[in-house]
Amino acid sequence: MAVLVVFLSFLVADVFGNEFSILRSPGSVVFRNGNWPIPGERIPDVAALSMGFSVKEDLSWPGLAVGNLFHRPRATVMVMVKGVDKLALPPGSVISYPLENAVPFSLDSVANSIHSLFSEETPVVLQLAPSEERVYMVGKANSVFEDLSVTLRQLRNRLFQENSVLTSLPLNSLSRNNEVDLLFLSELQVLRDISSLLSRHKHLAKDHSPDLYSLELAGLDEIGKHYGEDSEQFRDASKILIDALQKFADDMYNLYGGNAVVELVTVRSFDTSLVRKTRNILETKQVKDPSTTYNLAYKYNFEYPVVFNLVLWIMIGLALTLIVTCYNIWNMDPGYDSIIYRMTNQKIRMD
């Protein structure tokens, strides 16, 4: 019986060990205190609903309440930390929820909603994963964050420049000569550079279009794999990361005038068993897509009917013009209707 209880405790800790935390939020977005688990695949829907966008499926999660529909946040900042199930954040100022079914997710749907609704205002959309050298910048982010270090070589060079985190953060047991430590510190440098670059362009935080920031940090995970989670380096890195996240949340929250949502997702490891796996195209047995059995219509762009009508009526007008021209030429009398023949006959008479 005792063995069964221990096994169940480990199973529950494995399923609900990860966390979804709200570091900062305005008064118009209400997050309730509670221990309600949130599925990992629904985190993008939480971000979309908090910004006032609609989602495909209703979210029956009591953690997010209905706030002020006429006063939505100007920005959503989501930071995902890999390699740890939770961080020792200061109690009271942070609202945390258990995260179940930790599967990989992205905020592409939220970014698409921003692009479609605010295409003329060019909002800031920044999605960055420094450890994977993956960056996605659209709109005004291309001009604001063009000097942001995104590759591993750029991040390493940035650390050894002036005003870097190496000169201000207490490294303790971390070393500036270790590649794993430098990767972790470079991610903290990215957080500082984002808030610093945005502070130089404060007008972007005051426009009417919402902004989106999505950051994936894997440096702490690499330190845990290299030194071990019981090592002094891992404990020091966790403390440094907590302080850096708190400062980054305060900076982004203040830059947007207290009208920004800063969210944190801590995931020890993703559950790959819940991820849809791809199949080899050379396999003889193929699974047919269920959606194709219903003969669903293709999703066209909203500008398609406008362009279609323009092309259709222009082609109809050209066809009618061609028919009328051919009919008149076919029934034309060369001696009477043609100026060329008429002038030629007059010239002949005069001669």
From Swiss-Prot:
Expressed in the brain. The keyword Cell membrane applies. Residues 1-17 form the signal peptide. GO terms for cellular component: autophagosome membrane; axon; clathrin-coated vesicle membrane; dendritic spine membrane; endoplasmic reticulum membrane; endosome membrane; external side of plasma membrane; lysosomal membrane. One of its GO terms (biological process) is pH reduction. InterPro entries: Renin_r_C (IPR056780), Renin_rcpt (IPR012493). It comes from the Eukaryota. Interacts with renin. Accessory component of the multisubunit proton-transporting vacuolar (V)-ATPase protein pump. Interacts (via N-terminus) with ATP6AP1 (via N-terminus). Interacts with ATP6V0D1; ATP6V0D1 is a V-ATPase complex subunit and the interaction promotes V-ATPase complex assembly. Interacts with TMEM9; TMEM9 is a V-ATPase assembly regulator and the interaction induces the interaction with ATP6V0D1. Interacts with VMA21 (via N-terminus); VMA21 is a V-ATPase accessory component. Multifunctional protein which functions as a renin, prorenin cellular receptor and is involved in the assembly of the lysosomal proton-transporting V-type ATPase (V-ATPase) and the acidification of the endo-lysosomal system. May mediate renin-dependent cellular responses by activating ERK1 and ERK2. By increasing the catalytic efficiency of renin in AGT/angiotensinogen conversion to angiotensin I, may also play a role in the renin-angiotensin system (RAS). This is Renin receptor. It comes from Bos taurus. The lineage of its organism: Eukaryota, Metazoa, Chordata, Craniata, Vertebrata.
